[in-house]
A protein has these predicted regions:
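C-terminal motif of bacterial Sec signal peptides marking the signal peptidase cleavage site
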Residues: 18-20
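Concave beta-strand-loop units of leucine-rich repeat
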Residues: 30-157, 161-179, 183, 189-201, ...
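Hydrophobic membrane-insertion alpha-helices, especially the h-region
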Residues: 13-16
Length: 335
């Protein structure tokens, strides 16, 4: 055999060998996708969800991230109570922009919620403990929150966390020594806001909130000017008496003239009662409209319509506070 033919045969044999090696690495046609086991959980690389909840992962979160990056169809990664720091969970979330990454946040003494929560009711220190500014630093991870009640906690002064809540519709922050409302300017979907018994003196951050319809600023002793929100098309505006909220009467009357359809109350003393929560004597079309709403019931016939809806949104009926015993997904893990 000539030398040239030997060289050609050698190259041909080498090519067949390399092709065979490559083919061996591929799964057989029509075979099952590759499966892995991570922390005792069996899953496939083609899976759309990976749930590692209640497994102590801690510093092993990097292995989870490395694996998740190999899963092209991954839509949800759930790591509830895995002992991973919030900051590290945020790294995973940011590294997987096409995947919903979910973990658990504990706050107060008994309050808890997963980061995919849309509602948090944490307004009873006697039930869940006091919510503090330190707790609220963790609220930036609740990016899907729509309804939030953290009133009655007495120590809250920082609202910066709401900048991370683009879908926030309802905020009750009443009975806290809060002053600066600047972060609320980013909450473009905000529709309902209770600020009574706070230290706010400037409503200008609310001026651009075109969806805001219900505003309660009763018993805000430092508030003396409502002119920044003259253009807001509110449906209900509660200020309380001049003694409790010293806004000049001429400003109140000017707002009434600008918005004749708005229910403006600067006469009632109690900021959470009266027409704010209790229905006036509804008659005719208004009464018939109210009866057709899904949140209406015979038990709620004396509630103001918006307050009846609020009870549904925040789970007031049944005292659905965001506590461990009210959360069906919570489990004790011991770490």
């Amino acid at each position: 055999m000539k030398k040239r033919e030997k060289i050609l045969l050698l190259f041909l044999a080498l090519g067949l060998f390399l092709f065979g090696c490559g083919a061996a690495k591929q799964p057989p046609s029509g075979g099952e996708p590759e499966r892995l086991n991570l922390y005792g959980v069996d899953f496939g690389l083609e899976d759309e969800e990976l749930d590692l909840s209640y497994i102590r992962i801690g510093d092993g979160w990097r292995d989870v991230l490395k694996t998740a990056r190999r899963m092209p169809n991954l839509k949800r990664l759930v790591m509830d109570s895995c002992g991973v720091q919030n900051e590290d969970m945020a790294v995973i979330r940011d590294a997987l922009p096409e995947t919903e990454v979910i973990w658990r946040i504990n706050f107060g003494l008994q309050y808890t919620a997963r980061t995919d929560a849309t509602r948090i009711l944490a307004s009873s220190p006697s039930i869940g403990g006091n919510v503090t500014n330190r707790d609220l630093k963790k609220f930036k991870y609740f990016t899907k929150l729509r309804f939030l009640d953290i009133g009655h906690n007495e120590d809250i002064t920082d609202l910066s966390f709401v900048r991370y809540m683009p879908d926030l519709e309802v905020l009750i922050i009443a009975m806290n020594p809060l002053g600066d409302l600047t972060p609320l300017a980013d909450c473009k979907k905000l529709e309902y806001l209770e600020l009574f018994y706070s230290r706010t003196d400037d409503l200008s951050p609310l001026a651009g909130l075109k969806n805001l319809k219900h505003l309660n600023v009763g018993h805000c002793p430092y508030l003396k000017d409502i002119s920044p929100i003259y253009d807001l098309e509110l449906e209900r505006f509660y200020l309380g008496t001049f003694a409790s909220c010293p806004v000049p009467p001429e400003q109140v009357e000017h707002y009434r003239e600008l918005h004749p359809d708005c229910e403006v109350d600067n006469e009632s003393w109690e900021s959470s009662e009266g027409a704010w929560r209790r229905a006036a004597c509804l008659e005719g079309e208004k009464l018939e409209w109210y009866k057709k709403q899904p949140y209406y019931s015979e038990e709620r016939q004396y509630y103001a319509p918006r307050y009846a809806l609020l009870r549904d949104q925040l789970g007031y009926d049944g005292l659905q506070y965001s506590t461990k015993w009210n959360d069906p997904t919570w489990q004790y893990v011991g770490w």
